[in-house]
A protein has these predicted regions:
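An anion-engaging/catalytic patch
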Residues: 1-120
Length: 122
């Protein structure tokens, strides 16, 4: 995934990668009970729709190794990309999960902000 901050702040929903708070396509597939391949197709479609600038800033292609040690594509998504992707997920359960994600994005951003404001020892 990316750099984890510390275990007391780490969330299974969102995490930090290169200073950005993100989630990924694997988490989205698991939480929203979708096939990861289908989530990848949805992500790629959104990237085409939103264009290069927004897509490049908010969707980052990455990889992971599956249980058979094969390299598999995945995407890291910013809060904006996540919101765009799951906007159409409208079941009662999906709405509840979207709220949990929003709270986690907010909490993680606040944590990072607080860490940046902590004075460093001389």
């Amino acid at each position: 995934m990316g750099q984890l901050i510390d275990s007391s702040v780490h969330s299974s929903l969102v995490f930090e990668v290169n200073g950005k708070v993100v989630t990924d396509s694997l988490v989205i597939a698991k939480i929203f009970k979708k096939n990861h391949f289908d989530v990848l197709k949805e992500v790629r479609k959104q990237i085409v729709y939103v264009g290069e600038e927004f897509g490049g800033e908010n969707f980052h292609e990455s990889t992971y190794f599956n249980s058979k040690n094969r390299r598999i594509p995945k995407y890291d998504l910013t809060e904006e990309a996540f919101t765009l992707l799951v906007m159409g997920y409208t079941t009662r359960e999906a709405v509840g999960m979207k709220i949990k994600f929003m709270k986690e994005f907010k909490r993680m951003k606040q944590y990072i902000q607080n860490q940046q404001n902590v004075p460093k020892d001389p």
